[in-house]
């Protein structure tokens, strides 16, 4: 083989190595949510990449096979070609062979590492979806041609993995962390896929796992309660009407003569009892008031209050003492934002 043909073949092998490295890193790094969004926009190559990602072991085996073969052939062809090129172009025929071969090998390794490995890898990491959509379609042609070899090496690798107790996976784990979801939501806002209200709502929904009951609880000093009229009886209709006029709320905790919480009343429970302010409300009408620890995550508090169908709950400290109260509305508002109505204050 003449020098020019050998040099061109070496450059072709470096390009092939770069192709396989780029395809491999693009497949691993491409985010499925972005690819699905591109597919919905009519990008057929995005669908191709998604399907390729569902056969990840075969795709990666093919890339490794291509990289390995390209590297071996480059070493076989490239180093002798560079030796001849140096001898002819720079008049180094008198240089000791050992030094000349060492210099040639260093040049080939540098070109291989820079152009065949680092550059394509960083291009793929900088724009994985774009790179995957560019490289995967022709890469799949190679995979079809090399399928017997890929299947053989893939089966051998899976057998070895099972021997050491590792279960092979057919595709990447697509589970993402809260931080990654937050990043996706922020990117969707910047790209115009979400408006500000949707962005706020989704951000609040993610935050609910880190928010505690203590973050939305109303302190005891700010609670408007109604007191029973006498031991063993409930509050009066007049007392409830007064609390309603002062606050506009529809639910009020009930306390005994000692200030201890015994339940809560909904205003609709009182409407059917007449309009005499002196009428004493039967304690049977008073609804139970559950307790939730202040350290309980809001998501768990929401589930618990919905399960027992309670709109109010006492908030307790670690020692069991009551430190405040939380309303189901407060928990929901922390998730979706403030909901205003005619009585909101």
UniProtKB/Swiss-Prot annotation:
Membrane-spanning ranges: 3-23, 95-115, 312-332
Listed Pfam families: CBS (PF00571), CNNM (PF01595)
Subcellular location field: Cell membrane
Protein name per the record: Uncharacterized protein Rv1841c
Domain named CBS: residues: 217-280, 285-342
Gene Ontology cellular-component annotations: plasma membrane
Protein family membership: Belongs to the TerC family.
Predominant location category: membrane
């Amino acid at each position: 083989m003449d020098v020019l043909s050998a040099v061109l073949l070496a450059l072709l092998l470096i390009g092939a190595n770069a192709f396989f490295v780029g395809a491999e890193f693009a497949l691993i790094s491409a985010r499925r949510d972005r690819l699905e969004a591109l597919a919905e926009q009519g990008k057929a190559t995005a669908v191709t990449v998604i399907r390729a990602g569902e056969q990840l072991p075969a795709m990666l085996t093919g890339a490794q096979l291509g990289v390995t073969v390209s590297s071996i052939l480059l070493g076989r062809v490239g180093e002798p070609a560079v030796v001849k090129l140096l001898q002819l172009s720079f008049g180094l025929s008198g240089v000791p062979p050992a030094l000349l071969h060492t210099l040639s090998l260093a040049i080939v390794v540098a070109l291989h590492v820079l152009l065949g490995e680092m550059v394509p890898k960083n291009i793929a990491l900088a724009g994985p979806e774009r790179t995957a959509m560019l490289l995967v379609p022709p890469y799949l042609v190679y995979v079809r041609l090399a399928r017997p070899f890929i299947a053989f090496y893939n089966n051998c690798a899976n057998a070895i993995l099972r021997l050491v107790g590792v279960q092979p996976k057919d595709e990447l784990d697509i589970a993402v962390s809260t931080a990654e979801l937050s990043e996706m939501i922020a990117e969707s806002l910047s790209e115009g896929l979400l408006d500000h209200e949707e962005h706020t709502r989704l951000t609040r929904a993610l935050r609910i796992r880190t928010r505690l009951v203590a973050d939305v609880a109303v302190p005891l000093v700010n609670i408007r309660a109604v007191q029973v009229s006498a031991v063993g009886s409930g509050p009066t209709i007049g007392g409830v009407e007064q609390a309603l006029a002062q606050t506009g709320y529809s639910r009020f905790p009930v306390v005994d003569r000692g200030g201890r919480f015994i339940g809560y009343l909904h205003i609709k429970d009182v409407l059917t009892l007449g309009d005499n302010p002196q009428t004493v409300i039967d304690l049977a009408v008073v609804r139970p008031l559950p307790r939730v620890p202040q350290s309980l995550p809001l998501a768990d508090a929401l589930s618990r209050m919905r399960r027992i169908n309670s709109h109010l709950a006492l908030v307790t400290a670690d020692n069991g003492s009551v430190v405040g109260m939380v309303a189901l509305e407060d928990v929901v508002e922390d998730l979706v934002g403030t909901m205003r109505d005619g009585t909101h204050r």
